[in-house]
Amino acid sequence: MRVVFMGTPEFSVPILTAIIGHGYEVVAAYTQPPRPAGRRGLELTRSPVHEKAEQFGIPVFTPTSLKGAEEQDVFASLEADVAIVVAYGLLLPKAILDAPRLGCYNGHASLLPRWRGAAPIQRAIMAGDAETGMMIMKMDEGLDTGPVAMAEKVAITPDMTAGELHDRLSMIGADLMIRALGALERESLALQPQAEEGVTYAAKIDKAEARIDWSKPAKDVHNSIRGLSPFPGAWCEMEINGAVERVKLQRSTLGEGSGAPGTVLDDRLTIACGEGAVRLATLQRSGGKPLPAQEFLRGQRVTKVL
């Protein structure tokens, strides 16, 4: 089976690796173009999928759009049986969707129709969902609206971070995709339309959302911290030894106590919220590495959280 793989971030890599490892012929990899990196933006960084594809000698394409006739002709010339799309980052026009003999299949990190869109892992945790999952769907022209081929649910534990859920769903996605490809080969892949009820959208994370609002209930603050960990990272300003610093918050738990929002309630960094309190467990100063709260506090006095 001739496969075109379309993906960009680290989340996509285990799925690409599994497809290669199971002997499928990956004739091309499509990914986002290299991005400027470094302090001055003078270096170009290739995506994780780009790096992995080149390791296996797979031709890599990095168009900025697939809407043009030239790019669509190049894609069609690959004569793919199927395209596998996992966090690619570009919309696929109808000409691309129709080109592979068996269609295009997407690995999506939510239980559709909940959390269609760009940031389903973060949004599920930030909303306090108790479960999510991984789905394989056949793509149509809508935003994550196609019929579902396979799904697996995953419990979201109370302190699970987006990074932990990301890694879990990526591995599940690799297994599901291999099963889906096998069923496609056997012509036994059954498709079920998505439910019409329960549609929500996982908008891309805005940088402004990363600043913690201590006037919110503790459960919302905790969900924001873990939902934005490790990237982009929730943050706040702290008065440390009399100076105000910006600090990233990587882990937390629900704490006990109450007070004016932002009040430091004890020497274990329990912070009062609009309702209840949150205990900060892992923090990161600018230019530093993430540290457990006890180590973060060594020789430091936090008097205020803003």
From Swiss-Prot:
Q: Can you provide one Gene Ontology molecular function annotated for this UniProt record?
A: methionyl-tRNA formyltransferase activity
Task: Provide the binding site for (6S)-5,6,7,8-tetrahydrofolate.
Answer: 110-113
Give me the Gene Ontology terms describing cellular component: cytosol
Q: Which InterPro entries match?
A: Fmt, Formyl_trans_C, Formyl_trans_C_sf, Formyl_transf_N, Formyl_transf_N_sf, Formyl_transferase-like_C_sf, GART_AS, Met-tRNA-FMT_C
Sorted alphabetically, the keyword list is: Protein biosynthesis, Transferase
Q: Does the keyword Transferase apply?
A: yes
Supply the Gene3D superfamilies for this chain. Formyl transferase, C-terminal domain, Formyl transferase, N-terminal domain
According to its UniProt record, which reaction does this protein catalyse? L-methionyl-tRNA(fMet) + (6R)-10-formyltetrahydrofolate = N-formyl-L-methionyl-tRNA(fMet) + (6S)-5,6,7,8-tetrahydrofolate + H(+)
Q: What is its EC number?
A: 2.1.2.9
Taxonomically, which superkingdom? Bacteria
Matching Pfam families, A to Z?
Formyl_trans_C, Formyl_trans_N
What enzyme class is recorded for this protein? transferase
For this protein, the record's SUPFAM superfamilies field holds: FMT C-terminal domain-like (SSF50486), Formyltransferase (SSF53328)
User: Sorted alphabetically, which HAMAP family does this protein's record hold?
Assistant: Formyl_trans
Q: Which family does it belong to?
A: Belongs to the Fmt family.
Q: What does this protein do?
A: Attaches a formyl group to the free amino group of methionyl-tRNA(fMet). The formyl group appears to play a dual role in the initiator identity of N-formylmethionyl-tRNA by promoting its recognition by IF2 and preventing the misappropriation of this tRNA by the elongation apparatus.
Stated name of the protein: Methionyl-tRNA formyltransferase
**Origin organism of this chain?**
Brucella abortus (strain 2308)
Gene symbol of the encoding locus: fmt
